Amino acid sequence: MRNWKLLPVLALATIIVAVVLYVAFYFFFLDLFVDLWWFRSLDFEGYFWLRLLYRFILSGGVTLVFFSIFFFHFWIASRYLGLNPPDDVLLDADKRRRFQRFADVFMNGSIKIYTPLSLLLAIVVAIPFYEQWEQALLFFFGESSGLVDPVYGQNASFYMLSYPIYMLIQQELLYTAAILFLLVGILYWLEHVFVPNQNQEYPLGAKIHLTILMGFVVMFVIWGFILDRYSLLYVSNHEPVFFGPGFVDMRFYLPLIWLSIVTFLAVAITAGLFIFSKKHRIKWPFLVSLALFGSVLGLEKVKIIPDLMNQLIVQPNPVEAEGSFMKYNIDATLDAYDLNKIKIIDYQVSLDASQDIKDWSTKKHFENIPVWDREFLQDVYQQLQ
């Protein structure tokens, strides 16, 4: 009787499973199999699987790389560089044994925390790569276009294929380095506080490790400033005269970007010396460099200086001030449409049109001019010109 009671439940479960399988096959796998058979008939089955799996291979590879970076630094910080017992603990066998036992408990417990944390951080940091995997493929497999940017001398394919990925990679690597620096610093602090019988001074290995991580943060920030230079090429406030950077952009904003790099590097160096030096900690170099860096960033937001440059230098003689930048736009347009091989002939314009009219009268240029039709007269005149 018990088996008979289970039959309706089994029948209902079978129906539900069948419906789920049918829906999955109809909405997901039907197109997949049709495409597979089509590509297989063309002997392109390998390409089909690559096209299908590219996003998962790329996403999985990026996640694995970021997970390895996080896990490696956490593992180094907890295993080797964070423990600094004094000499009396190392010389006494009982104290050394107790210290090692507590340290082992701390390291084994911390690995259970930072392993899933590394995976979670890797997934969060790699999310933009999941969404823009097609651009990443173009970055890896794109070829040179053969056209050179007249401003910075970069290949045109750099701006279409590489520059967007560089912006994405720079942000993700900066987040990764900053998170690592913060969390590894917290891990060293926890080891220093909760593991007993340690020196008050942090070990040399921990300082070197934190300095390296801080160096990565600085490097990625500077890389971001360098990439900001290329954003000046997308300025459109000079249209319809020309597209791209003008006098103010290249003579004011570009030097500010370089000043931002120099002052931020000074902030990083003075901060590192202040944090990691044992003695003679002086605050004023760090404060001065920080104030200079903040001033440079503030100048980018102030509009009075570029407005004055525009009013006093550009507007009185725009051709003289921005002629070279207009030429950049002209050269780029000629390269884009492959017009740089055209022979250019300069015609001398005579202010006296009587001779031109006399010549035209013999060449019958006026036969088809609709002088009676006001609607078409101006268009025909423009065509003749």
Q: How should these model regions be labeled?
A:
Residues 1-3:
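N-terminal hydrophobic targeting signals that begin at the initiator methionine
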Residues 5-9, 15-18, 22-385:
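Soluble extracytoplasmic regions of secretory-pathway and membrane proteins
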